[in-house]
Amino acid sequence: MKSKVPMKNIRNFSIIAHIDHGKSTLADCLIAECNAISNREMTSQVMDTMDIEKERGITIKAQSVRLNYTLKGEDYVLNLIDTPGHVDFSYEVSRSLCSCEGALLVVDATQGVEAQTIANVYIALDNNLEILPVINKIDLPNANVLEVKQDIEDTIGIDCSNANEVSAKARLGIKDLLEKIITTIPAPSGDFNAPLKALIYDSWFDNYLGALALVRIMDGSINTEQEILVMGTGKKHGVLGLYYPNPLKKIPTKSLECGEIGIVSLGLKSVTDIAVGDTLTDAKNPTPKPIEGFMPAKPFVFAGLYPIETDRFEDLREALLKLQLNDCALNFEPESSVALGFGFRVGFLGLLHMEVIKERLEREFGLNLIATAPTVVYEVHLTDNSIKYVQNPSELPPENHIACIKEPFVRATIITPSEFLGNLMQLLNNKRGIQEKMEYLNQSRVMLTYSLPSNEIVMDFYDKLKSCTKGYASFDYEPIENREAHLVKLDVRVAGDVVDALSIIIDKNKAYEKGRALVETMKELIPRQLFEVAIQASVGNKIIARETIKSVGKNVTAKCYGGDITRKRKLLEKQKEGKKRMKAIGKVELPQEAFLAILKID
């Protein structure tokens, strides 16, 4: 079978950039220049298909598009794979880069290299990708192209003397960039005559076609009459359809060949049947070994999600299952809370992932949700020499059964203007950080490497980092190991009852300070009741902080005009008895703000 476009004329490349460096806008420019979408259909951020992506100006789901371009009379196929830039979605980046031969490293001419860019460049270098530096936003008055080129050379060690200078917004330098992609990025390699070997680097659910796999054909070819073996599951399926990717519509094709990127429909009901990183091969003539080196995405942060309307528990399950069809990193299991009823313990890649999922559940499925404080997974060594992994504070065994607790640590890389160095180091010390390295990239920018406990960064670290550096610092992290720590469970009691959804695992030295701040905040948030309410913070059985909400008093003596004082006293005693009884059996409704307050407290 003859290839439609010779393999030497195919270029597979992705775009690496930090949030807000103009990656999606540059992708739009390349699409427009290659006429992949008509002017009428062209919208800004055409590669970002979710509303939430456009509103937040971020890319979450990696998209792909096939572009046709003619250079010097020869036809080329350019497969552009758009990748997310946020630290939470780095698993999307790693799988996308596995299917490319080259990457455009897009850096904002006004901001220079950021921490997330460095992390993604290292993934690209590990995959032996050809990296093309691209300086974007050169038309801005405060652009400093020479300094940024020097910055890239000093930080990453890539020669930038011939770096492309573009402005995606003003469409400057786009033709030159396309020519550079064709002349510099190598063509894919692979054996056209070998058995089919295709890497699944993304999958999603389509309402009409079921689960779809976005694949890169490494060896061989695939056609619509073939039977396919999914190597991870060992199951065989017929091919229902093959398509080329395009943001607005899928373009049908009869076959996909070595070096190409395309969409495969096998008529499956769930993306779990075609896991990302799995290998597709020919059922009759399978490839001997699957493609190596893929790790399934592991949740980093866990939180409880509970519907405010308790009868919508099943709706929440359905909604999570639907989101899971598109998001293999999302996992969940049912749990119950005395305070909140039935809900789910959900695993996320990070805080942005958690926010996005919660917002999508509320927006797309009309659910009202309460999210509990995010936690990480703790390794608890018990006195009987067994090990228990705890992701929910309520599962922590009693203190006398625990030999030691180990918590996960991450290695954080932070790039900051040097004027904010003092503030930043103070923040990192408050978060129990241990400095590993400090490096001046130039006179005005510093790169810090710290090891930090994971539970210190899942709360509010990102917001604090941005506020203490006026938004200029950038941050990236990678998990390293579990280390022993002095941790305790901090409980909040309202009217004598432990509110399990407000429990947190915290460093022993911070427990008093956090407990005091918590009860003071709760006092402001819980409405006054007809009886007195005690709010207490406790570690084990020891109360470490307390606040009292005074009761609302009804004037029961208002109807007594003059007369005997004993009549008034009798009414007041009766009221006192009633309040006592209320206090014994009364339940306090906690507002949603009380659960959110725990996230905001230092």
Swiss-Prot record:
It is found in: Cell inner membrane. Its EC number is 3.6.5.n1. Pfam families: EFG_C (PF00679), GTP_EFTU (PF00009), GTP_EFTU_D2 (PF03144), LepA_C (PF06421). It is an enzyme of class 3 (hydrolase). Keywords: Cell inner membrane, Cell membrane, GTP-binding, Hydrolase, Membrane, Nucleotide-binding, Protein biosynthesis. One of its GO terms (biological process) is positive regulation of translation. It comes from the Bacteria. One of its GO terms (molecular function) is translation elongation factor activity. PROSITE patterns: G_TR_1, G_TR_2. Residues 8-189 form the tr-type G domain. GO terms for cellular component: plasma membrane. It is a peripheral membrane protein. The keyword Cell membrane applies. Required for accurate and efficient protein synthesis under certain stress conditions. May act as a fidelity factor of the translation reaction, by catalyzing a one-codon backward translocation of tRNAs on improperly translocated ribosomes. Back-translocation proceeds from a post-translocation (POST) complex to a pre-translocation (PRE) complex, thus giving elongation factor G a second chance to translocate the tRNAs correctly. Binds to ribosomes in a GTP-dependent manner. This is Elongation factor 4. It comes from Helicobacter pylori (strain Shi470). The lineage of its organism: Bacteria, Pseudomonadati, Campylobacterota, Epsilonproteobacteria, Campylobacterales.
